[in-house]
Structures are given as C-alpha cells and as structure tokens.
Amino acid sequence: ETKDINKQEYLLRIKKVTDYIHQNIDQPLSLQKMAGIACFSPFHFHRVFTILTGETPTDYIKRTRIEKAALLLKQNKELSATEIAALCGFSSLSLLSRNFRLHFSMTIREFRSLK
C-alpha cells in the first residue's frame, strides 16, 4: 500500500511538471527547473519522469512542441511558420523544420497543404 501511495505521489509531481511544460512550451525548459517543480533532484526527476511517461523529459518536450506546431499550422493559416516556431519554443524555423520532418515524415509546407 505504501508503494501505491508513493506512485500516486510521484504521478502527481510529474503531472505538475507536464502541466508546467504545456503552459510554458514557448519558453526554454531546463531539467533543473522541472526537477524543482517535482521536488526531486535532477537525476531522480529524469529517472522518475522517464519511467512514468515512457519518454525522457527532452523527448516529451520536443514531441509536445511539434504537436502544438502541427495544431497551429492547421488552425492558424495566417501565422507564418517562423511565428509558430517561436510560439512553440523552437529557437529557429530551421530547428522546427528539421524536427517536424523527422516526426511527421513531411515538410511543414506539405503538412499545411493537406486537407
């Protein structure tokens, strides 16, 4: 039962971090900051986050940024890809483009032209 309580506590702490990531996706997100939110050391946070989410914090952030970019590309045709890159926390359009192509196996332009 203590193990279940600990897991629930850990899940709540990681949920606080994922909420923070989603609310601040346009900002730089450091391991130290996220570990602090979860009240873990950076090493322990990385371990717990990866076990509970199935992704490293870095991979989770990258995927969340790309998914937000895809949503904005579809919903806001008036926003440029450069503006979307900034809104999603990518430091440049080329970084968004490279990650987008790796994730979706198509370019931003190809994605935007899909019906």
Give residue spans per PLM region.
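An amphipathic alpha-helical interaction segment
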Residues: E1-Q23, Q32-K33, A38, P42-H44
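Intrinsically disordered, low-complexity sequence elements enriched in Ser/Thr/Gly/Pro
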Residues: L11, Y60-R63, L96, E110
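Terminal helix-turn-helix DNA-binding modules in bacterial transcription factors
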Residues: I14-Q32, I51-S91, L114-K115
